[in-house]
């Protein structure tokens, strides 16, 4: 998979299927099911390491898990998160991206935030590093803002749209929108030329992403409203992953009950 192909999929209206993976076997079976983008997310802090948030995840953790994923990912585009406090300044962002790309073999790095990270996105883009932005609910900011839908009021919606445009202008090649009203997600998607991947953002983004553990019903505690346990109606993990891919491609997922705003 290439960025060029992902952009062509957006232009053609073909849904992009993204899924998190944290180790080799997960990556292998995701690709076998037809997943086109693998996100090595700092969500591993919660679903793999058992933390309450993503904040304890280190850059070393991210490099380690990205390495494992890439050993068995021979087809999907791989995005790796730059973890909390590894984007304190331009120097730390460049160092973090270099490790994720060189040691982890990631194809792209992801940065959370809007205006705060525009300069960093520009610098990475100028150096030829593919960058994915992340707006809406920002897991790395939960200590301050909590888990809540973003962009429900007109002012915050306008700010998110403006920040999305700023990220694209700075050189972002892709954008994740998390927990924003479906109508706002549609508006942002239509206003950008780069692929927009949604999670809890309705069905009119260019693609969808879910955490693997939610797809397989492995969530500890209450599962997010925007998620679906595909294993409950399947006879194997492989079948569940195939069904997730099929439902995203056909538009069956997400359904109205998975919208959060």
UniProtKB/Swiss-Prot annotation:
Gene Ontology terms: biological process: pantothenate biosynthetic process
Gene Ontology CC: cytoplasm
EC number: 2.1.2.11
UniProt keywords, alphabetically: Cytoplasm, Magnesium, Metal-binding, Pantothenate biosynthesis, Transferase
InterPro entries: Pantoate_hydroxy_MeTrfase (IPR003700), Pyrv/PenolPyrv_kinase-like_dom (IPR015813), Pyrv_kinase-like_dom_sf (IPR040442)
Cellular location(s): Cytoplasm
Active site: 178 (proton acceptor)
Binding site for 3-methyl-2-oxobutanoate: 42-43, 81, 110
Cofactor: Mg(2+)
GO MF: 3-methyl-2-oxobutanoate hydroxymethyltransferase activity; magnesium ion binding
Top class in the EC scheme: transferase
Pathway of action: Cofactor biosynthesis; (R)-pantothenate biosynthesis; (R)-pantoate from 3-methyl-2-oxobutanoate: step 1/2
Family note: Belongs to the PanB family.
PANTHER family associated with the record: 3-METHYL-2-OXOBUTANOATE HYDROXYMETHYLTRANSFERASE
Protein role: Catalyzes the reversible reaction in which hydroxymethyl group from 5,10-methylenetetrahydrofolate is transferred onto alpha-ketoisovalerate to form ketopantoate.
Protein name: 3-methyl-2-oxobutanoate hydroxymethyltransferase
């Amino acid at each position: 998979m290439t960025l060029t192909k992902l952009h062509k999929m957006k232009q053609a209206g073909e849904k992009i299927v993204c899924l998190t993976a944290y180790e080799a076997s997960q990556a292998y079976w995701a690709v076998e099911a037809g997943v086109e983008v693998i996100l090595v997310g700092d969500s591993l802090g919660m679903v793999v390491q058992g933390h309450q948030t993503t904040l304890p995840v280190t850059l070393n953790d991210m490099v380690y898990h990205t390495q494992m994923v890439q050993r068995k990912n021979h087809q999907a585009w791989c995005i790796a998160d730059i973890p909390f406090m590894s984007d304190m300044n331009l120097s730390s962002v460049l160092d973090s991206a270099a490790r994720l790309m060189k040691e982890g073999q990631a194809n792209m790095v992801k940065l959370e935030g809007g205006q705060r990270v525009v300069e960093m996105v520009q610098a990475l883009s100028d150096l030829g590093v593919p960058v994915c932005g992340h707006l809406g609910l920002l897991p790395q900011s939960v200590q301050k803002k909590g888990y809540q839908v973003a962009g429900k009021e007109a002012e915050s919606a306008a700010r998110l749209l403006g920040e999305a445009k700023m990220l694209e202008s700075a050189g972002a090649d892709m954008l994740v929108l998390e927990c924003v009203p479906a109508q706002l997600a549609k508006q942002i998607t239509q206003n950008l030329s780069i692929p927009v991947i949604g999670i809890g953002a309705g069905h009119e983004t260019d693609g969808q992403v879910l955490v693997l553990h939610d797809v397989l019903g492995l969530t500890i505690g209450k599962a997010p409203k925007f998620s679906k346990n595909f294993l409950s109606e399947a006879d194997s993990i492989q079948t569940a992953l195939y069904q997730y891919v099929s439902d995203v491609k056909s538009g069956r997922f997400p359904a109205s009950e998975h919208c959060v705003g």
